[in-house]
Every structure is written in C-alpha cells, then in structure tokens.
Amino acid sequence: MEKSWFNLMFSKGELEYRGELSKAMDSFAPSEKTTISQDRFIYDMDKNFYGWGERSSYSNNVDLLVSSKDIRNFISDDTFFIRDSNKNSYSIYFDIKKQKFEIDNDLSDLEFFFYSYCSSSYLNNRSKGDNDLHYDPYIKDTKYNCTNHINSCIDSYFRSHICIDSHFLSDSKNSNENYIYNFICSESGKIRERKNYKIRTNRNRSNLISSKDFAITQNYNKLWIQCDNCYGLMYKKVKMNVCEQCGHYLKMSSSERIELSIDPGTWNPMDEDMVSADPIKFHSREEPYKNRIDSAQKTTGLTDAVQTGTGQLNGIPVALGVMDFQFMGGSMGSVVGEKITRLIEYATNQCLPLILVCSSGGARMQEGSLSLMQMAKISSVLCDYQSSQKLFYISILTSPTTGGVTASFGMLGDIIIAEPYAYIAFAGKRVIEQTLKKAVPEGSQAAESLLRKGLLDAIVPRNPLKGVLSELFQLHAFFPLTKNSIK
C-alpha cells in the first residue's frame, strides 16, 4: 500500500503527533481551498520533503488535520505517530477493511525525518512576526491541548464512517497502556461489542484488549432505551418510555407501571408464589411448555404474566393488577386468571377501588380450555364486584390488548381508559385478513378509532394518568387516608 505523509502536528508538551493517510498522491483531489497559516511539510513517494514555501502547489490539495470535515476528504486508512511522556515512540495504525488496530514500535525511519525537520535551521531561524505566514502559534503555546484536539478529530472520523467511539492516548503514568474503548452499533440500534475486533502490537502480537473487556455497555443499557419508531435514544426514568422526539409510546414492564401509579413504599404484592403446573401436559416439538415458562421467568423475574397487589395512589387505597407483555406475550392462563380473580375478591371484601392494566395477546393456547374459562371466571367475579357491591372498576388498555382479554375484563370497566396509539382488538389484523381475504383499514384497531366509535371513555397519556385516576376515585367517593397524602 502506497503511503503519503502530511500534516505534522507537534508541541513541546508531553505528547507529539504526526498524522498519515494511506492514499496515492496522484489521487488527492482538491476538495476545497484552505488557508494555511501554520508551517507544514509534505513527504512524497520518493521520500523528499517539501515545505509549503517550496511546493506551494500542494496547498490546495492537502487539508489540515483540524476537523472531522477535513479528514473525511480522505477515505482511507489512518496512522498516528505518538511519543509519550516516557519518550517511547510508536504509531497506531487502523486498517478500515479489516477493522483492526495495529501498534507499531519500529519507527526509526519516521523519527529520523521527524527530528531532522524539528532541528532544521529553517525552523529555528525563521521569523516569528505577525506577518510571517509560516508562524505556528501552537509550537510556542505549550498549554495548547493537542491531545484533546487529535482525540476529537479521531472520534468524529470513526463515528461518521464505521460507528466507533474511540478514546485514544490516555495520558497516564503507564503511557504504554492506552486503552481504546470501542462500541459498535448493531442493526437493532443497541450498543454492543464487536466480537472479531482486536488490538495487537507488532512486537509481541499480544492482545491488549479483547471483547470480554466491553461489559461496560451492559450497565448503560439499563439507563437508556431506543425508540423503535424513530430510533432516538432517551433516558428511561425521566421520559416514561415516551419518545421525546416523535411521541411514540414504547412498551413498559409491569414493574415500571406499578412504579408509575403507586406511591413509593405502599405496594403490597399478592400471590407471588403462584406458578403454572402445565395442567394439560402440553406437547410441543419446538420447545416444551415448561421450558418456555422457565425461560420467561428468568427473563422477566416474574412467576407469570400478571402482578397483583394493593397500594396507595396519591394516598387512596387501591387494588391493582398489571399484565406484562414480556412474559409470553401477556397471555392469560390459569395462573393469570386465578390471580386476577383473587384480587377482585379481595377488593370486594375490603371495598377497594380496582384498576386492571391490560397488555395481552389473549388466552394462552398451551393451557387449552382452562385458559378460555378464565374469561368467564373473571367476568363472574367482576359482576358481583360492580353490580352487587356497587364498587368502582377502571380498565386501562395498553398496546397491545387483544383476544380473550379484550373479550372479557378488558372491556368491562366502569371507566375504560386507553393509552395513545394503543393497538386494541379481538382478532389481530393478520388473522382477519387471512380469514376474510380482505384488507383491514389502516388505524381501524387503534385507540383513537375506538374512541370515535364509543368503545372507550378516554385516551390519557402516561404523564397525567396518575392524577386523572386520583380525580376519578375522589369523584366516586374514594378519598385519601389523610389529606396530607395528596400530592
């Protein structure tokens, strides 16, 4: 590979740099005219040096290593010449095609030309006046942070071409350990480490950093979430999983919804130890039902697809059940039905208002008719709760709410509230189109369409939801335990 050296940058500080781009000199096309006020030199294919005064024809063909915009004019491999505080010299070379870093310690040829130029009489004897076009103020200014400047250029270049965030040349006591943290964006948009990405030295070919050292990214995945509509990043805790850029509503876990609605320190879960026993011994060639249950439990930390319990909402005691779509699609089996039934019976005995947050794909097919009978069982206890005891039940429909949940307790609330843009239906769009051989109109199963047709009472965003629920409860004579509990 032919090499062309240009743009020497150095200072009298602890670090000295030289930048290189591997590209033939005859392929350097003028990208834009630049005004050059610093003293620079060029090293061509015949290893001849030219100052800007001697070969002024290059002034329009070579850009300074000043910004990422200038670097982008040369799409090729990069090498940086470094001399650390311990007087050790080496270069970091990046091969774009192979995506590997290579640290080279054999720089005798480069050092010869570098120090020859630094000690030249032309450099030492030239004028330092204001009118001198060759005067470089950064050589005199030892406070100029060349390290940060180069790091910024490299970061911008790598981010714009191969989605790498790099932190080069850490100025530490052990300057030979210059760690390069690289985080490569996968197709799903999440940050992950590149498995085949290695850094090696020419001297001993030993790996300085391997893929195992990048567990840092896992810690940040808990703080940030990516919108699946516009792919923007947002902080989980502040935005309530609502994209601040496009307004798209992302899915929330049952624990997040409990935290959103219930006052801190007042949540008392019920029937946490209730698990499915595979009542019909469902057989599957792909994966046994018990294995799917175990896998979902490990992934979500839940025993089944619903959390039930009691707590306080702005000081008002309530009974709350929240379905979790991450647990087998929020499907309703015997455990889900039994937990919701027990919650309603407890709310009936204690005269508590009831909230059920629905997020489900329907009845769980692995439990057959036992899952279908949960629809009738829950509807039966709800009838006693609402009609006989005259208590107040609010149903909150989130995306998606379909199947047996929609056909039973999901649409039985005294007040039915939906989140914006929620997908609410009995049969899914694909099932309807395959059965009827007709296209389903776009948006006909969205919450906004159902509200216009009178199937919903209100569409409430997540931010004011807790306040709206509190006002509805007080309107129906459910008040806080103490006046000071209202926030």
From Swiss-Prot:
Single GO cellular component term: acetyl-CoA carboxylase complex
PROSITE patterns in alphabetical order: COA_CT_NTER
Enzyme class, UniProt record, top EC level: transferase
EC number: 2.1.3.15
Cofactor: Zn(2+)
Record keywords: ATP-binding, Chloroplast, Fatty acid biosynthesis, Fatty acid metabolism, Lipid biosynthesis, Lipid metabolism, Metal-binding, Nucleotide-binding, Plastid, Transferase, Zinc, Zinc-finger
Signal peptide limits: none
Superkingdom of this protein's organism: Eukaryota
Subunit organization: Acetyl-CoA carboxylase is a heterohexamer composed of biotin carboxyl carrier protein, biotin carboxylase and 2 subunits each of ACCase subunit alpha and ACCase plastid-coded subunit beta (accD).
Protein's UniProt name: Acetyl-coenzyme A carboxylase carboxyl transferase subunit beta, chloroplastic
Organism (species): Barbarea verna (Land cress)
Gene: accD
